[in-house]
């Protein structure tokens, strides 16, 4: 009897212990834990709990070849954004010799207007209809109009096609970071910064295309060659070949995006939409395909409660009220509001400082006696390619720095300050070799800041409003690009004042980076 009673007590204690462990496991499943960036903001307890489960599942699955495919295919978007923006600036001078436009900076403004509208359109619709559609469609739109730009019969038509091509490309910086981040395990989040290396690859491609076509298939500028033949379509095909080739390359990239990965909607977008079953199905699909564990179930998601989608979308998902609701969501708490404002300010400042520097520097150096001579087109585009190649490695270093205790904030601050130092030093350039060297170093240092800002922005934005917040941020950047083009047309470019203003802006950007409210290092994005 005593043995039987003792055995019964042991079974009872064992059952009680199992019950306690089960309760603790359930509590851990639905609690926020210490890892989420926005965990202390308490904007939506149900959504926060579900997001914690999704992050746990993504971390449990780990990094797979699926993520490498995402890294490359999303990187295409980065490359295309920089490719289209640079191609228009590269071909503008040769196209102007053929068309004799009344407003030489018109192509720059057309490109930035297209990029602005694209960033806002693709970013905001990504929060409404999802990331998948824009991921599959945007590059197709870009490629079609890029090819059309090469066949333009007039300056105005060229500007229109550049604007439409830029519209397709303009949403990629918004979408690519969001798509990659929302599938990415937390231990690999610094790869989001590394992905900005694709921006440099796009610049490098632009340099190679210019180097290959323009020296061999372009008319000569009468300003430097008085005996040059009149510039016509027949003897000035180089800039058209650049557009045809770049458009075709983007089209191939768009087909690869659609066929290689057949992207499923991101799990974090699905959670925000209240589509828990689809979220679980997506993560289980990835786990099964790559033979990984995934303990997330629909029951665990439903145990957290029901997501209030009306609070995230407004009264109507398809009206302006939805856009307003997503904008309000970025200011749900005081710290989130400060973070959003500082991010937008940073994008505004860098959007003005970098193009303004490039606009004023050549005239400033010329007025101070810098003697570069008139290099051949071959040497011009060789140097351009070298500078763009240097820009690839800034995000590589930044990706490593972000994975250390420096974190994102101090990586940005250091990148901005070092860039400022070399900007000041660049004003003392006097020879062609110095010009090439400093251009390469500045491209490298600038992309440390730029690449980290690209990654930091989506990391600290809530997933339900990520596209809207990121789109508006990049939109401010594009507005400043338009402003810089206008300034270049009407301002006196012989003064040193703009150079020092640009340097001061980089100091301000470094200060803003340090006081950002959130540091993603060691934490998980929502």
Regions found by a protein language model. Give the residues of each.
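Cytosolic juxtamembrane N-terminal segment immediately preceding the first transmembrane helix
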Residues: 1-93
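Flexible cytoplasmic loops linking transmembrane helices in multi-pass membrane transporters
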Residues: 37-69, 228-237, 246, 284-359, ...
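Extracytoplasmic
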Residues: 67-101, 206, 210, 354-365
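Helix-breaking motifs and short loop linkers at transmembrane-helix boundaries and internal kinks
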Residues: 99-100, 130, 151-157, 168, ...
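C-terminal transmembrane bundle
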Residues: 109-112, 124, 162, 166, ...
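Conserved MFS/SLC helix-loop-helix module at the cytosolic interface between two early adjacent transmembrane helices
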Residues: 117-156
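Helix-loop junctions at membrane interfaces in 12-TM secondary transporters
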Residues: 150-161, 215-219, 427-438
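Central mid-sequence intracellular linker of multi-pass
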Residues: 195, 212-313, 503-526
């Amino acid at each position: 009897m005593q043995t039987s009673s003792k055995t019964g007590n042991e079974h009872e204690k064992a059952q009680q212990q199992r019950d306690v462990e089960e309760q603790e496991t359930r509590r851990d499943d639905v609690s926020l834990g210490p890892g989420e960036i926005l965990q202390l903001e308490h904007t939506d307890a149900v959504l926060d709990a579900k997001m914690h489960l999704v992050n746990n599942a993504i971390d449990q699955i780990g990094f797979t070849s699926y993520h490498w495919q995402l890294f490359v295919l999303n990187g295409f978007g980065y490359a295309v954004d920089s490719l289209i923006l640079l191609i228009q600036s590269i071909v503008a001078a040769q196209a102007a010799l053929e068309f004799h436009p009344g407003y030489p900076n018109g192509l720059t403004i057309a490109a930035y207007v297209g990029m602005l509208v694209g960033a806002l359109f693709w970013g905001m619709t990504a929060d409404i209809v999802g990331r998948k559609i824009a991921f599959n469609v945007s590059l197709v739109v870009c490629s079609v109009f890029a090819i059309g730009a090469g066949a333009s019969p007039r300056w105005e038509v060229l500007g229109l096609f550049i604007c439409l091509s830029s519209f397709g490309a303009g949403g990629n910086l918004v979408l690519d970071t969001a798509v990659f981040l929302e599938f990415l395990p937390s231990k690999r989040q610094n790869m989001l910064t590394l992905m900005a290396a694709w921006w440099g690859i796009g610049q490098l491609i632009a340099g190679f295309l210019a180097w290959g076509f323009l020296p061999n298939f372009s008319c000569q500028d009468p300003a430097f060659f008085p005996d040059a033949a009149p510039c016509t379509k027949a003897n000035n095909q180089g800039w058209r070949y650049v557009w045809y080739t770049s458009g075709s390359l983007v089209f191939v990239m768009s087909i690869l995006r659609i066929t290689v990965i057949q992207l499923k909607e991101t799990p974090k977008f699905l959670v925000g939409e209240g589509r828990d079953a689809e979220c679980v199905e997506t993560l289980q699909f990835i786990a099964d395909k790559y033979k990984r564990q995934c303990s997330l179930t629909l029951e665990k998601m439903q145990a957290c409660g029901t997501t209030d989608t009306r609070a995230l979308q407004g009264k109507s998902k398809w009206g302006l009220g939805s856009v307003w609701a997503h904008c309000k969501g970025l200011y749900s708490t005081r710290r989130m509001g400060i973070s959003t404002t500082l991010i937008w300010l940073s994008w505004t400042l860098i959007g003005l400082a970098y193009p303004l520097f490039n606009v004023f520097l050549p005239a400033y150096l010329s007025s101070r006696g810098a003697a570069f001579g008139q290099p051949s087109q071959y040497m011009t585009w060789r140097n351009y390619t070298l500078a763009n190649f240097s820009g690839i490695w800034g995000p590589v270093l930044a990706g490593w720095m972000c994975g250390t205790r420096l974190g994102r904030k101090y990586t940005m601050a250091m990148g901005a300050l070092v860039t400022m130092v070399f900007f000041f030093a660049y004003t003392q350039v006097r020879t062609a070799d110095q010009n090439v060297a400093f251009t390469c170093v500045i491209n490298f240092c600038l992309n440390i800041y730029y690449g980290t800002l690209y990654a930091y922005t989506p990391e600290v934005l809530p997933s339900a409003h990520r596209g809207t917040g990121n789109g508006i941020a990049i939109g401010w950047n594009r507005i400043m690009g338009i402003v810089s083009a206008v300034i270049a047309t009407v301002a006196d470019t012989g003064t040193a004042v703009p150079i020092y203003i640009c340097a001061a802006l980089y100091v301000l950007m470094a200060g803003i980076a340090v006081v950002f409210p959130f540091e993603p290092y060691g934490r998980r994005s929502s």
